[in-house]
């Protein structure tokens, strides 16, 4: 785990830094999606049995329509503030660890990949769960592929692991390796509502921390209820009443 930074990063330094280098990798965590969502986050083991739902697509779609679509719906204010952040002429790559990618005007990498982990059991063609959801329209039916095979969720649909190609996409967004030497592709990492116990997040932080110099910064926007999980902690900036407020604050400061 990366060491804590004792010295507070002045806001004017951060703002000048972003305006000068015009780049950032923005990592979105589960807290930004779950904020203010009044839906039960966990269902009973009987309702959420992975093996059962993989074998029985109807149970998967029932769970998906009743829980996942609601749980991971982004609040309008959060979506607007994050999109505004990406429109500040920054060369940005977003790593979205949530279930649905709703951001535009930027390159989005989704490590969880849950919305792309449906496939035909016959020809193994991949399908997007969100698109299938809209086709389903709450009907209790089995979706068919053009080849005639049934479309079913895979184990990866439930976020049990990250496939290696996703690891490589994430690493390539932040790091470059040439002739055995690793360098950074971005000057700024911005974490918004992330889970620092996630192995991928920890690896990113440790690697970035080992390579960065005075021209590289890490920014954390987190709820004050989660500040004990923040590795890079800035009392003046990182703690807010909510994540949306934190992003809005950054946007306001950048626009000054």
Regions from the PLM with identified roles:
Residues 1-256:
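Conserved catalytic alpha/beta core of Sir2/sirtuin-type deacylases, generalized to analogous enzyme cores
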